[in-house]
Design a protein with these regions (language model features):
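AMP-dependent adenylate-forming
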Residues: 8, 26-51, 157-158
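Conserved pre-ATP/AMP-binding loop-to-beta segment of ANL
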Residues: 35-38, 171-204, 211, 234-240
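Conserved AMP-binding/adenylate-forming core of the ANL superfamily
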Residues: 39-93, 110-115, 168-174, 219
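Conserved AMP-binding A3 loop
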Residues: 50-54, 192, 200-224
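Conserved structural elements of the adenylate-forming
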Residues: 57-62, 215-236
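Structured binding elements
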Residues: 99
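Conserved ATP-dependent adenylate/AMP-binding module captured primarily in the ANL superfamily
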Residues: 109-142, 225-242
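ANL superfamily adenylate-forming
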Residues: 132-196
Length: 245
């Protein structure tokens, strides 16, 4: 009897699935294939701003370069404490492209929860959305010996901040540009070195019956899910998806 959930032999109904056996490889192959096409939109001050695949790739390349300049190594964990914003996606893709593990943290979590999730995931770099989330990170930073840097997306109200352990996303991208100028092939070497069996993301449970547990998802598992979804649900290049969590 065939396995009901074995989708490996089914061919996709659409051409949306690009080549690649890791999420990072699929992303960079999609950039090459769809460069000038619009990929994401975000409303800023009431106006929708569009991001093409090429623009996304440029930002991801710079953030990834910045991470590598800070000594971020393959299979290290970077956590993201933020609402759903473009920067969340950029940071996530940069971490994965570096061969790292991405861990999302709810922006509604208290400082104590942020501490637990960062400690349990062995987070070395923490991305935070703004001053509100930064306050939580700073409150527990001394209890996180593995945490090396905190990166802030939105620096509004923080421009006078002078803390060697905290930098803006803009500064991280600047470091990335400098790093990439000296090590042009470093990022793609990381992407090519990533394997399907490598850990890609951690998704923590709600912790209703105890402490939250980090579900471990590999690149291979995520790619299999993407291909299965695109096999069973017909989509076109004109379709759009909304992120609301």
């Amino acid at each position: 009897m065939s396995n009901l959930w074995d989708l490996s032999q089914i061919q996709p109904r659409t051409d949306l699935v690009v080549a690649g056996d890791t999420i990072s490889a699929m992303f960079w192959n999609a950039v090459e294939q769809r460069g000038p096409n619009v990929w994401m939109r975000q409303k800023e001050l009431g106006i929708w701003r569009s991001w093409t695949w090429q623009q996304t790739a440029e930002a991801v390349r710079e953030i990834a370069g910045g991470l590598m300049s800070l000594g971020f190594k393959p299979q290290e964990t970077a956590s993201i404490l933020s609402n759903t914003v473009i920067e969340w996606v950029l940071a996530d893709l940069a971490v994965l492209s570096c061969g790292g593990v991405s861990n999302g943290i709810y922006p509604t979590d208290a400082a104590s929860q942020v501490h637990y999730l960062c400690e349990d995931s062995r987070t070395t770099v923490l991305f935070v959305e703004d001053d509100e989330q930064l306050d939580k990170a700073l409150e527990v930073r001394e209890q996180l010996p593995m945490l090396r840097k905190i990166v802030v997306f939105d620096m509004e109200g923080l421009h006078k901040l002078d803390d060697p352990g905290v930098l803006s996303l803009a500064k991280l991208r600047e470091l990335g540009r400098e790093f990439n100028a000296l090590h042009a092939d470093a990022l793609m070497q990381r992407v090519k070195a990533c394997k399907p069996e490598d850990l890609a993301i951690l998704v923590y449970t709600s912790g209703t019956t105890g402490k939250p547990k980090g579900a471990m998802h590999t690149h291979g598992g995520l790619v299999y899910t993407v291909r299965g979804y695109n096999t069973l649900i017909a989509r076109t290049e004109a379709d759009e998806c909304m992120c609301f969590l």
